[in-house]
């Protein structure tokens, strides 16, 4: 339970023996949300002892192979774990995600014993919120890549302040569901008097905001979308010396990624989606150095396969 982030993979293009393709799983009070699902994702999930059966929603950024080729394996395994899945699986992504998944399920005769709900995103037309419940919501944001691509914003809703029991007794508010109504942020009527939540509840606690951003070139609109986020996991595909190649392929350098989060005043930044050419630890450390040179006041770190981050007040602690 709680609010945790698991780094499933950190690479780009193809999986390496020590680095799977970029994928992140967010756990929130028993609900699991998987972002991207490249080749080998199920292997990394197994290594980290994370059950694919508990995945509520899979959000795909775009239809390039290194972000989607592991999806069908997860879909298949959910019907082969010895237990029947009770809840539907939600699969979200840009236009084409439904045809890709359904056509392959039919062609490969993949058996599924559960419902799949598709949420195709028509960029700038589809409602920004693609998932929402009482405690959280997920929004998409347009990215700048060679094909239609989106980033995802996982937003924890503000938590109500502490319930003032003494004040409730003073106002003759009976125990039970009516107090819960106030805690849910709704007004109540007692003896002809309207009582607002603000009269009973203390100051609310701001929810945490997490963004998953890959693949994209630099563009100003993104800065506003992730303004003041608690954590942004963002691609850092190339070293600064390869900026021309990054710009051509619509990817980010380490310095480019840091420049975006610096302008957005992001509290914590995790670098991800490392080029396959960077196989040595010192190569990755150089990416980190370049990012920190651009944003020396920011808290920037390298994500690593198997890393786990746990929410702690206004930030996340690496475990």
UniProtKB/Swiss-Prot annotation:
Catalytic residues identified in the record = 66
Q: Can you name this protein?
A: Ribonuclease Z
| Known function | Zinc phosphodiesterase, which displays some tRNA 3'-processing endonuclease activity. Probably involved in tRNA maturation, by removing a 3'-trailer from precursor tRNA.
Q: Supply the alphabetized keyword list.
A: Endonuclease, Hydrolase, Metal-binding, Nuclease, tRNA processing, Zinc
| Family membership | Belongs to the RNase Z family.
Give cofactor(s), names only: Zn(2+)
- What does the entry comment about cofactor binding? Binds 2 Zn(2+) ions.
Q: Which residues bind Zn(2+) 1?
A: 62, 64, 145, 215
Reaction equations catalysed:
Endonucleolytic cleavage of RNA, removing extra 3' nucleotides from tRNA precursor, generating 3' termini of tRNAs. A 3'-hydroxy group is left at the tRNA terminus and a 5'-phosphoryl group is left at the trailer molecule
Q: Which SMART domains match?
A: Lactamase_B
A matching Pfam family? Lactamase_B_2
- Quote the gene name from the UniProt entry: rnz
Keyword tRNA processing among record annotations? yes
Q: Could you confirm whether the keyword Transferase appears in this record?
A: no
Task: Provide the residue positions that the database annotates as binding Zn(2+) 2.
Answer: 66-67, 215, 273
| Annotated PANTHER family | ZINC PHOSPHODIESTERASE ELAC PROTEIN 1
Q: Which InterPro entries match?
A: Metallo-B-lactamas, RibonucZ/Hydroxyglut_hydro, RNase_Z/BN
- Molecular-function GO term, any one: zinc ion binding
Tell me the leader sequence span.
none
The entry describes its oligomerization and partners as: Homodimer.
Family matches, as SUPFAM superfamilies: Metallo-hydrolase/oxidoreductase
Q: What Enzyme Commission number does this protein have?
A: 3.1.26.11
Broadest EC class assigned to this enzyme: hydrolase
């Amino acid at each position: 339970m709680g609010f945790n982030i698991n780094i499933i993979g950190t690479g780009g293009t193809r999986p390496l023996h020590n680095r799977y393709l970029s994928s992140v799983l967010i756990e929130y009070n028993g609900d699991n949300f998987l972002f991207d699902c490249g080749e080998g994702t199920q292997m990394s999930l197994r290594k980290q002892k994370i059950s694919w059966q508990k995945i509520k929603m899979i959000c795909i950024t775009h239809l390039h192979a290194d972000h989607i080729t592991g999806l069908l394996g997860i879909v298949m395994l959910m019907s082969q774990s010895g237990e029947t899945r009770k809840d539907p699986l939600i699969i979200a992504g840009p236009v084409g995600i439904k045809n890709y998944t359904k056509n392959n399920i039919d062609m490969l005769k993949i058996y599924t014993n559960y419902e799949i709900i598709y949420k195709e995103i028509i960029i700038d037309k589809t409602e920004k919120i693609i998932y929402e419940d009482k405690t959280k919501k997920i929004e998409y944001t347009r990215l700048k890549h060679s094909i239609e691509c989106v980033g995802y914003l996982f937003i924890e809703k503000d938590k109500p302040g502490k319930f003032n029991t003494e004040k409730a007794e003073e106002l003759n508010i009976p125990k039970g569901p009516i107090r819960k109504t106030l805690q849910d942020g709704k007004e109540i009527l007692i003896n002809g008097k309207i009582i607002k939540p603000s009269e009973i509840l203390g100051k609310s606690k701001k929810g945490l905001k997490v963004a998953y951003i890959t693949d994209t070139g630099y563009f100003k609109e993104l800065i506003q979308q992730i303004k003041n986020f608690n954590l942004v996991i963002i691609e850092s595909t190339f070293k600064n010396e390869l900026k021309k190649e990054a710009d051509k392929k619509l990817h980010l350098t380490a310095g480019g990624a840091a420049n975006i989060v610096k302008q957005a005043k992001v509290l914590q930044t995790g670098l991800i989606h490392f080029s396959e050419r960077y196989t040595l630890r010192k190569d990755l450390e150089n990416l980190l150095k370049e990012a920190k040179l651009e944003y020396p006041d920011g808290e920037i770190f390298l994500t690593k396969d198997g890393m786990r981050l746990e929410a702690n007040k206004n930030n996340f602690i690496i475990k």
